[in-house]
Structures are given as structure tokens and as C-alpha cells.
Curated annotation (Swiss-Prot):
Keyword vocabulary terms for this entry: Cell cycle, Cell division, Centromere, Chromosome, Kinetochore, Mitosis, Nucleus, Phosphoprotein, Repeat, TPR repeat, Ubl conjugation pathway
Subcellular location: Nucleus; Chromosome, Centromere, Kinetochore
Residues recorded as bearing Phosphoserine in the entry: 59
Remaining remarks: Present with 80 molecules/cell in log phase SD medium.
TPR repeats: 215-248, 295-328, 329-362, 363-396, 397-430, 431-464, 465-498, 499-532, 536-569
Effect of residue 39 to T: In CDC23-50; G2/M cell cycle arrest at 37 degrees Celsius
Stated consequence of mutating residue 114 to S: In CDC23-41; G2/M cell cycle arrest at 37 degrees Celsius
Protein known as: Anaphase-promoting complex subunit CDC23
Protein encoded by which gene: CDC23
């Protein structure tokens, strides 16, 4: 076979392999696509074909009718990839799809195109993340590292057999692989490489030429900076990325994770509407303007959901998005979650029912649906949901959380904890799983384990109200009320209009001896109450505190409010109203108001036998003086 014939065959094979790698990946046959890309990378070089010319310099003859129809052209994607770079992209992309991240990094080690550089460094980051997650799986299972694991990490062999003979050449090879592996696992080296590349690349281009490749690198830099707790620089990188390319929803979510309190969100919102600008290269038409860019509107809604803002500030954006996206399941799930956060469980359940009918195989947000069914004690419906999602995908974090809620509803807390651990093994950032697992440990009276779970939750998401609230409750169970007070205060900054948090803050202040602050908290709780029946116990507690402060007139006022609530609720009696009637009867007897005292005593128709007997005794005493 002469050289011309061989080159022609190689050229045809190259075209066919490119076509196979691209089309098989498009139709999700990742194994076959990876094989074709590997074969393409291992193909011999064609002598008469210049493989380094740019796509912009493609010969117009490619579009002539004489070219066979089966000829596969490299897509004119505007990424500026040469033929060699495109072949590398196919190989790296298929290896990435097959989750062979280290191999992807190896084959892309010398790339200079920003898109390929992102693919390489993103693979490197995911490889590091995968290894760190695998090390955490052991903690979730056993709670500690064993000596065998330490030896395996140290010596590379967990079997304990230290008599394996290796040649010097083998040791050298192992050392080389180990050093390269260690370098790939070092997150700081990834950040350094990104910074070096961005510094050199930004010099070469004008500000308006920033493209998607640059946006992706800024995004990855932000993710790594956030991982290293450098929040301010991470936010700066995310904003640069969004300025170049605004439709990266993951970048918006990462930016939101940088917000720890409501004030941060307000400052960011002001910055977005006053100083932020979109670049023209990747943002089209109306989406270049802050006013009409839908991603900013989605971001504002997500921030409202996470930081429990006032609905009036976001209602206009929500109405606009619902008009533009009337069938977007994400928005419907958002609406349902808002109802859940506002404790409107009936509306939330109805909205989730509609979502399940519209998109029955969507598992996102269904763990919130299971929380609603759990709180409403609809155990049969929760059991059906758990069975349904397990048939769709048993190995999704959402599925594990739903099954865990089902076992918790059946009081099988050990099984519930097991499924929450599975959810965390599948996705270690599932904050909800950490928080709910903490609740399960509280049910088992294991406060120390609960505290550890809640701490993990707030480490991942400092905006998690339930985790801060859970920490306060766990320390309250241990009678460590100053610690409890601190964590309840943190929770209060996230939900200042929640009645429950002011009530527990009042209890904490009361137990630490600060009665004045306790009274203030209880009064704030009353203002935040939505219905009258929620206030009975608070009125009685306020009356007790005023009695301890020897302010009997204020005490009497709140005792009377307790009784008034009973009348407003059409005679529904609580323990507090019974005690309030007895206290008022004694108070009026001391004041000489026997008729009024008699009425209070006769109003005690239920309660403990001791309370009923005391009421009869007071009534008899009143009759003797009347």
C-alpha cells in the first residue's frame, strides 16, 4: 500500500471516528463514543493534511456538491477549535461523560483553548471532589478512621502484607504516578493554574470579546475559592462569570450560597441593579439589560425562598415569570415551597399534587413534599410516595430522604437515619438530610450526635434556619441554655417574623434569669402570631413572669387574656386557661371580689382532679362570703 492510499484511508477513518464519537455521545451511548474518541486519538498522523489550521480557514471546497454526503464536517461552533483541538475535545468529553476524570486531565494537559482548559480543570476538580467524598463515606458509616485505613492511605496497601518485593523500576513508576496523583488532588494547584491562565488570556483579548470559555473558567475559580472559604473573592469571580454569560444557573446558585444573611442579599441586590453590566458577546437582545434579564429575576426569587424575605418585594417578578413560563415545573415547585415555608401546608400539598400530575418522574423538590405529608400525618400518602419514587430511582438523594421520612413516621428512627446517611453518601451537600438526621437523633435522645448533624448542615448552608433552630433545641435538652440562646439568636436573624423562634428565645432568657428580655421576646411572639389560639400558652407564661417580678396588675391582665382566648375559641379549654382561672379566682378572693372569684372558679369544668377539687373549694369559700 503506497503512502497516498494509506493517507486516504486514514483520512476517511478520521472522519468516520469523529462522526461516531459525536453522534453516539449525542444519543447517550457513552461507552461506544469513548471508544471511538480513544481510537481517534490513537490514529496515525496523515502526512499531507495540515491538522493545525483553524476552522475559520476551512476550504470552501468542503461545501461543493462533489463532496460525499457521508463526509463529517467539524461543527462550526465558534469555539475556535482547530482540528487537533476538536479531536482532543471529543476524547476529553467522552472520558468526562464516562466519569474517567483523571484520564481526561491527562490527555488535555497541554491545551491552551479556554474551553478545553475549563474541561481539563473541571475534570481535575471533580476528581478531587470524588476522592474527598469517598473518604467521607467512611465517616458516615463508622464515624472514625480505622488503623487499617490509615495504613492503606500511608502504604498504599490495606492488606497488611509488607513483604511484597518490588523492583527499583516499579518503585520509580509508582512514585511518579503517586506524585502526579497528589498534584491532581491538590485543589490549590487547580486554583493556581486557573489564575495563571486567566492573567495571560485576559491580556490577549478586549473586554467585549469575553466568551463562554472565559465565563466557565471564572465560574470554576469561584467554586474553588468558595471551597477554600474565600467568600468575597468567590463572589467577585461568580459576578465576572455572569457578566460574560448570564444563563449559567449553577453559577447563580453558587453566588447565592455565598450569602449568609439578609443584609448580604440586600447589598448584592443593590449592586446588581446599580453597578452590574452584562457583556454583549454572549448575552443577546433584551437579556443584556438588567431590567429584562430573566436570570436575575429567577435569582431574586431563589434568594427570597432561602432567606425568607417579604413576598411583596418579589411578587412582581414572580408574576412576570409565571406569564413567561406558565408550564415551568421549577416555578410551580418554588410556589409550593414558599407555601411550605409559610406553614401553609394545605396549599403546599395541593401545589405538589399538581406538580406530580404534570411531571410524575421529576424527583427534584419531592423531599419537601414528603416533609409536608409527614407534618400533616398523612402516612398512607407518604408510604405511596416513598414506594413510587423508589421505583423511579432508588439511588437519588431525594428518594433516600423520602424513604427516611416514611420510616420516621413509623417511629423506626434507626432505619430513617440509615437512609439519611445514604442520601449524604450520594450527595454530601444535601443540607436537608443532615438537618432531618439531627431530628432523628433527638428522637433517640442522642443530643451529641444531633448536634454534630446540625453543625454539618450549617457548615454547608449557613442560611439553614432549621439547623440553627435544631442546635438551639439540642443544647436546651442538655440544659446548656447560654449555648442554646446563641443558636436561637442565629436562627432569629434568618426568620425574624417566625413566632416559634421568639417563643423559644423567651424560654431561654427565662431559664438564664433574664426575665425582662424574656417578656420582650414573648410579646414579639404574640405580634408574629397569625391566629389567637397560638397565644394562650404565651399569655400564661407572660403572666408568670410578671408575677415573679411582683407586678400583679400586669400578671392579672395576661391571665385575663388567657381566659378571653378560651371564650373566643368557643369554650375550647387548655391547661393554661384552667390555671389562669384558678389564679384569678384566688386573686379576686384576696381583693374581696367574691362574686367575680366565684364565676372564675365555676368556669373550671375540666383539668386534673386536683385542679377541679381546688376550684370547688374556692367556690365554696366564695359562697360563704357572699
Amino acid at each position: 500500500m503506497n503512502d497516498d492510499s494509506q493517507d486516504k484511508i486514514i483520512h476517511d477513518i478520521r472522519i468516520q471516528l469523529r462522526k461516531a464519537a459525536t453522534e453516539l455521545s449525542r444519543w447517550k451511548l457513552y461507552g461506544s463514543s469513548k471508544w471511538a474518541a480513544e481510537a481517534l486519538a490513537g490514529l496515525a498522523e496523515a502526512i499531507d493534511v495540515d491538522q493545525t489550521h483553524s476552522l475559520a480557514d476551512e476550504s470552501p471546497l468542503r461545501n461543493k456538491q462533489g463532496v460525499p454526503k457521508q463526509m463529517f464536517e467539524i461543527p462550526q461552533n465558534g469555539f475556535g477549535l482547530s482540528e487537533t483541538e476538536y479531536d482532543l475535545y471529543l476524547l476529553g468529553s467522552t472520558l468526562f461523560d464516562a466519569k474517567e476524570f483523571d484520564r481526561c486531565v491527562f490527555f488535555l494537559k497541554d491545551v491552551t483553548n479556554p474551553y478545553l482548559k475549563f474541561l481539563k480543570l473541571y475534570s481535575k476538580f471533580l476528581s478531587w471532589d470524588k476522592k474527598s467524598q469517598e473518604s467521607m463515606e467512611n465517616i458516615l458509616t463508622t464515624g472514625k478512621f480505622t488503623d487499617e485505613m490509615y495504613r492503606a492511605n500511608k502504604d498504599g496497601d490495606g492488606s497488611g502484607n509488607e513483604d511484597i518485593n518490588q523492583s527499583g523500576h516499579q518503585r520509580a513508576n509508582l512514585k511518579m504516578v503517586s506524585n502526579e496523583h497528589e498534584s491532581q488532588s491538590n485543589i490549590s494547584s487547580i486554583l493556581k493554574e486557573i489564575n495563571t491562565f486567566l492573567e495571560s488570556y485576559e491580556i490577549k483579548i478586549d473586554d467585549d470579546e469575553a466568551d463562554l470559555g472565559l465565563a466557565l473558567l471564572y465560574y470554576l475559580r469561584g467554586v474553588i475559592l468558595k471551597q477554600e472559604k474565600n467568600i468575597s473573592k468567590a463572589m467577585s469571580s461568580f459576578l465576572k462569570s455572569l457578566s460574560c454569560y448570564s444563563f449559567n444557573w449553577s453559577c447563580w446558585l453558587e453566588l447565592m450560597d455565598c450569602l449568609q444573611k439578609v443584609d448580604d442579599a440586600l447589598l448584592l441586590n443593590n449592586y446588581l441593579y446599580q453597578n452590574f453590566q452584562f457583556k454583549f458577546s454572549e448575552n443577546l437582545g433584551s437579556q443584556r439589560t438588567i431590567e429584562f434579564n430573566i436570570m436575575i429575576k429567577f435569582f431574586k426569587l431563589k434568594v427570597f425562598e432561602e432567606l425568607n424575605g417579604q413576598l411583596e418585594d418579589y411578587f412582581e417578578d414572580l408574576e412576570f415569570l409565571l406569564q413567561v413560563f406558565p408550564n415551568f415545573t421549577f416555578l410551580k415547585a418554588y410556589n409550593a415551597t414558599i407555601s411550605y415555608n409559610n406553614l401553609d401546608y394545605v396549599t403546599a400539598e395541593s401545589r405538589f399534587d399538581d406538580i406530580v400530575k404534570q411531571d410524575p418522574y421529576r424527583l427534584n423538590d419531592l423531599e419537601t413534599y414528603s416533609n409536608i405529608l409527614y407534618v400533616m400525618q398523612k402516612n398512607s400518602k407518604l408510604a405511596y410516595l416513598a414506594q413510587f419514587v423508589s421505583q423511579i430511582d432508588r439511588f437519588r438523594p431525594e428518594t433516600c430522604c423520602i424513604i427516611a421520612n416514611y420510616y420516621s413516621a413509623r417511629q423506626e428512627h434507626e432505619k430513617s437515619i440509615m437512609y439519611f446517611r445514604r442520601a449524604l453518601t450520594l450527595d454530601k451537600k444535601t443540607t436537608n438530610a443532615w438537618t432531618l438526621m439531627g431530628h432523628e437523633f433527638v428522637e433517640l435522645s442522642n443530643s451529641h450526635a444531633a448536634i454534630e448533624c446540625y453543625r454539618r448542615a450549617v457548615d454547608i448552608c449557613p442560611r439553614d434556619f432549621k439547623a440553627w433552630f435544631g442546635l438551639g433545641q439540642a443544647y436546651a435538652l442538655l440544659d446548656m441554655h447560654l449555648y442554646s440562646l446563641y443558636y436561637f439568636q442565629k436562627a432569629c436573624t434568618l426568620k425574624p417574623w417566625d413566632r416559634r423562634i421568639w417563643q423559644v428565645l423567651g424560654e431561654c432568657y427565662s431559664k438564664t434569669g433574664n426575665k425582662v428580655e424574656a417578656i420582650k421576646c414573648y410579646k414579639r411572639s404574640i405580634k408574629a402570631s397569625q391566629t389567637v389560639d397560638q397565644n394562650t400558652s404565651i399569655y400564661y407564661r407572660l403572666a408568670q413572669l410578671y408575677e415573679e417580678l411582683e407586678d400583679l396588675q400586669e400578671c392579672k391582665k395576661f391571665m385575663m387574656k388567657c381566659v378571653d382566648v378560651e371564650e373566643l375559641l368557643e369554650g375550647i379549654v387548655t391547661d393554661e386557661t384552667v390555671k389562669a382561672r384558678l389564679w384569678l379566682a384566688i386573686f379576686e378572693i384576696k381583693a374581696g371580689n367574691y362574686q367575680l372569684a366565684y364565676d372564675y372558679a365555676m368556669g373550671v369544668s375540666s383539668g386534673t382532679s386536683q385542679e377541679i377539687e381546688e376550684a370547688r373549694m374556692l367556690a365554696r369559700e366564695c359562697r360563704r362570703h357572699m
